[in-house]
Design a protein with these regions (language model features):
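Active-site neighborhoods and metal-handling regions in enzymes and metal-associated proteins
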Residues: 1-256
Length: 256
């Protein structure tokens, strides 16, 4: 069931989303060669808690950390570790959810670490651009499928794989609510968008095949061909005037 949010609820989600965005901005600055993903996780948790929030992912179905930290061929749900030290040329996807007063804000970025190969940088750029292509389709009267259609069309035009196994979602008091928001499909699929819907749009795009598998930790999803992946996400509310991005950072685009 899709829950339309009241103006008060949207304000609550806005507060959580700003905290998520601010935390991600801090992590982008801290993610350099030599730092471990566990150190980044500690920074994120301390920042969220010191600003009155709760790290939503920690303990969610047993997930042990504040951030999902996925490196290179890892698509989503990588577990931070003291043994995972970032290296020059890596790409690091950080997916982060924080909550304030029972409402969540969800966002993700993929960060180039040091000097990254041009073909991988292009993957990051196109993936981030595809997120905004999807957000452009957030209009009253459009169907949810218009979002995925825009993402898929743009990314496949560049020869990239569009992950099918993980999708975007609604958000509110629960971290994952209806509707599901695939990054593929046709314009006429899915429910109609209505004012008050809060959507997490999150393209997960690969340099090779779209197929993924989950590692033995039961969390980390990787590309089956070992090629790099990118992941960007925003929390967006549907309004009569179009989309409003609630998790926008001060620097709107990470990849220039």
């Amino acid at each position: 069931m899709i829950i339309l949010k009241s103006p008060h609820e949207i304000e609550c989600i806005r507060k959580a989303s700003k905290l998520t965005a601010d935390t991600l901005s801090l992590l982008v600055k801290m993610a350099k060669p030599g730092i471990t993903t566990l150190e980044l996780d500690t920074i994120a948790e301390e920042y969220i808690r010191s600003h009155g929030g709760i790290p939503s992912c920690k303990g969610y179905y047993g997930f042990p950390a504040t951030i999902c930290a996925s490196i290179n061929e890892e698509v989503v749900h990588g577990i931070p570790s003291a043994k995972r030290k970032l290296k020059n040329g890596d790409v690091l996807s950080i997916d982060l959810v924080s909550s304030i007063d029972g409402y969540h804000g969800d966002s993700a970025v993929t960060i180039p670490i040091g000097h990254v190969k041009p073909d991988v940088m292009k993957l990051l750029k196109v993936t981030e651009e595809s997120l905004f292509k999807g957000i452009e389709q957030v209009k009253v009267g459009n169907r949810i499928g218009a979002i995925g259609h825009a993402v898929q069309t743009y990314c496949e035009k560049h020869g990239y794989g569009v992950v099918r196994d993980f999708v975007g979602h609604g958000l509110g008091r629960e971290m994952h609510e209806d509707p599901q928001i695939p990054n593929y499909g046709s314009l006429d699929q899915g429910p109609l968008m209505k004012p008050g819907m809060v959507l997490c749009i999150e393209p997960m795009i690969t340099l090779g095949t779209h197929r993924v598998r989950v590692l033995g930790d039961d969390w980390t999803a990787v590309t089956v061909d070992g090629k790099p992946a990118a992941h960007f996400e925003h929390t967006v509310v549907v309004t009569e005037n179009g989309p409003e991005i609630l998790t926008m950072r001060e620097e709107p685009r990470l990849i220039k």
